[in-house]
Swiss-Prot record:
The gene is glsA. It catalyses: L-glutamine + H2O = L-glutamate + NH4(+). Substrate binds at residues 66, 117, 161, 168, 192, 244, 262. One of its GO terms (biological process) is glutamate biosynthetic process. It comes from Photorhabdus laumondii subsp. laumondii (strain DSM 15139 / CIP 105565 / TT01). Belongs to the glutaminase family. GO terms for molecular function: glutaminase activity. It is an enzyme of class 3 (hydrolase). This is Glutaminase.
Amino acid sequence: MSTTFSNTLLSDILRQVRPLIGQGKVANYIPALAEVPADNLAIAICTIDGQIFHAGDAEKRFSIQSISKILSLTLAMTRYQEQEIWQRVGQEPSGQPFNSLVQLELEKGKPRNPFVNAGALIVCDMLQSRLSAPKQRMLEVVRKLAGCPDICYDSKVARSEMEHSHRNAAIAYLMKSFGNFDNDVLAVLQTYFHYCALKMNCIELAKCFIYLANQGSTIGSEQQILSPRQARQINALMMTCGMYDGSGEFAFRIGMPGKSGVGGGIVCVVPGEFTVTVWSPELDRSGNSLAGCAALELLADRVGRSVF
């Protein structure tokens, strides 16, 4: 399986997509993210037999942003029964911007899925109810999954997001008005923004999410993080909802479950085989990494891998 991968292959893919740098836009509504140099470019693969391949700036850490929504949902799945989660947040694509209030108002405060901001805030609200120290618990989980004890939050990014949190606060208060929010809004926002401000590199992310390619189990230690059913559910949500309102196009072009963040990172899963992560800070119109999507499309074509 892993014989199709090599560092040379990944370097060649980055060489082909590098001319796209300059055609997208770095996220600027969070000032700390706007300062990230646009020419960063990286890719990394982790196979279920433990091999790592990488190229470019794969050891440079960045703010994972909405990629963290997979981790918060994973944590919630270990603390709640299935029906408890899905009665508060849906499983459908939204077709709306990730921070939309309109759909939330029409649907009486129940977010479409856990990967839009409203849905992720519900998940964080649920974690706030069950964990005494949700920020510390997330660090423990991520450090263990990635095998890196020094992974931490970028306090500058978290602070910058909190200072520009008006829309997310409005989303939370709207859900609270419909009775779908239990805890103090500011406390939940603090947790949510810290999760978004996790700093990881592509290699760490590829290793971190290998449990989604391995029926919910880590490799090496073989620790069962989720049941095979739960891992399947997250992969399905990534395929249908993971790339904002560009999820359909991403499935069409690349054919892998994926989750992006406005920091320019994307993580993808091919169940039973591997995880792949890319990073390029410039985004397309849907808020997904422009060069990153192109690199994933090239990879899918070159190695003939997708879930279809």
